[in-house]
């Protein structure tokens, strides 16, 4: 299946392009109190090394806003301020931040939005219209309830509001906590505008539930060419958010980066400690950014076939096994020596590609 992405306008968050032909970026949000400068920077650095492109922070009051100014000066990543209720905080933060997210359901009057737009326009920073099914404006929830119809009305109303103020550096999110409703909301809005979309399932839950919901919703949308930046929302799991997001991009075939591990589910034919081997391989290869297919198989039934499609592979047997590279056997070793040799071949494969580039 050919992947064809919906062509959107391009905006810029710090040094990260979003929309157009830009790669789909991955975002996260800190769970520190923003006024905790040291703690916030520690989490930003963790996200940076995990492979995040953009970070969002909450701003509840002026103490947060002033701290955010200091955090921004030391951050290795572009920062977006997340504003609810108090538009004055957005106006203040626009002086130094890379982007603003507003919730149309609680930002207040048109005059409030006008002030935010003026500040962002002067700095040349974008605004995300963050529509959330749990906080729709009363004028739309009264008429449509808290479903997708109300979300669409809210999105189009607020898009027009910004456009009427001659502001077009816009991205949009349509988040619900339900995978099907999230898909429907983004699909129905996509033909109505050409602004870039920020994909996400809100309040998705802990690691297990978030991974399932986000994979269904975001994977579905990405395969339809919808989405320009994304976040996998996950309770208290910073690095895992990035890891799952990158895996969704890779396994949907949208973006190739990092290691794709093919491993068998195990059965009675296995005569080796495959589970331990896979855990070691996952841990030792998670730093690799180069797109790489590797195969870790527990017996010969499918191992050789999978190895033909892998860059580097292990085929375990009884007390011994094969290391295979691009379909060619490079070593036959005792089981205890297999993983180390396999990892050495993986690193050599990465180095050989870097040299060619």
UniProtKB/Swiss-Prot annotation:
Catalyzed reactions: (2E)-4-hydroxy-3-methylbut-2-enyl diphosphate + oxidized [flavodoxin] + H2O + 2 H(+) = 2-C-methyl-D-erythritol 2,4-cyclic diphosphate + reduced [flavodoxin]
Cofactor: [4Fe-4S] cluster
Cofactor binding description: Binds 1 [4Fe-4S] cluster.
Keyword Iron: yes
InterPro entries: Dihydropteroate_synth-like_sf, IspG_bac, IspG_bac-typ, NO2/SO3_Rdtase_4Fe4S_sf
Keywords carried by this UniProt record: 4Fe-4S, Iron, Iron-sulfur, Isoprene biosynthesis, Metal-binding, Oxidoreductase
Enzyme Commission identifier(s): 1.17.7.3
Residues forming coiled coils: none
Any single GO BP term: terpenoid biosynthetic process
UniProt GO MF annotations: 4 iron, 4 sulfur cluster binding; 4-hydroxy-3-methylbut-2-en-1-yl diphosphate synthase activity (ferredoxin); 4-hydroxy-3-methylbut-2-enyl-diphosphate synthase activity (flavodoxin); iron ion binding
Keyword Iron-sulfur included in the entry's annotation: yes
Residues that coordinate or bind [4Fe-4S] cluster: 264, 267, 299, 306
Top-rank EC class of the record's enzyme: oxidoreductase
UniProt pathway annotation: Isoprenoid biosynthesis; isopentenyl diphosphate biosynthesis via DXP pathway; isopentenyl diphosphate from 1-deoxy-D-xylulose 5-phosphate: step 5/6
Job description of the protein: Converts 2C-methyl-D-erythritol 2,4-cyclodiphosphate (ME-2,4cPP) into 1-hydroxy-2-methyl-2-(E)-butenyl 4-diphosphate.
Entry's family note: Belongs to the IspG family.
Protein name stated in the entry: 4-hydroxy-3-methylbut-2-en-1-yl diphosphate synthase (flavodoxin)
Organism: Campylobacter jejuni subsp. jejuni serotype O:2 (strain ATCC 700819 / NCTC 11168)
């Amino acid at each position: 299946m050919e992947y064809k992405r919906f062509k959107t306008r391009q905006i810029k968050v710090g040094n990260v392009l979003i929309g157009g032909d830009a790669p789909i970026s991955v975002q996260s949000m800190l769970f520190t109190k923003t006024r905790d400068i040291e703690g916030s920077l520690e989490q930003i650095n963790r996200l940076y090394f995990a492979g995040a492109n953009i970070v969002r922070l909450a701003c509840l009051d002026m103490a947060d806003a002033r701290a955010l100014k200091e955090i921004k000066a030391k951050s290795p990543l572009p920062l977006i301020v997340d504003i609810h209720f108090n538009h004055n905080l957005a106006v203040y933060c626009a002086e130094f931040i890379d982007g603003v997210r507003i919730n149309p359901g609680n930002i207040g009057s048109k005059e409030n939005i006008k002030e935010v737009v003026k500040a962002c326009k002067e700095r040349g920073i974008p605004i995300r219209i963050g529509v959330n099914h749990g906080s729709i404006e009363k004028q739309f929830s009264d008429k449509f309830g808290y479903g997708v119809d109300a979300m669409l009305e809210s999105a189009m109303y607020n898009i027009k509001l910004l456009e009427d103020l001659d502001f077009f550096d816009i991205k949009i999110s349509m988040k619900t906590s339900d995978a099907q409703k999230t898909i429907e909301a983004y699909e129905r809005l996509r033909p109505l505008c050409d602004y870039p979309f920020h994909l996400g399932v809100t309040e998705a839950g802990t690691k297990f539930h978030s991974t399932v919901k986000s994979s269904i919703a975001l994977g579905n949308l990405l395969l339809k060419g919808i989405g320009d930046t994304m976040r996998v929302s996950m309770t208290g799991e910073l690095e895992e958010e990035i890891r799952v997001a990158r895996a969704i991009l890779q396994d949907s075939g949208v973006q190739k980066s990092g290691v794709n591990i093919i491993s068998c589910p195990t059965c009675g034919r296995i005569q080796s400690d495959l589970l331990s081997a896979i855990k070691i391989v996952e841990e030792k290869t998670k730093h690799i950014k180069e797109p790489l297919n590797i195969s870790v198989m527990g017996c010969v039934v499918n191992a050789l076939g999978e190895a033909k499609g892998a860059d580097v592979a292990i085929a375990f047997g009884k007390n011994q096994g094969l290391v295979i590279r691009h379909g060619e056997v490079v070593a036959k070793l005792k089981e205890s020596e297999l993983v180390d040799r396999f990892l050495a071949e993986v690193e050599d494969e990465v180095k050989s590609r870097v040299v060619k580039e």
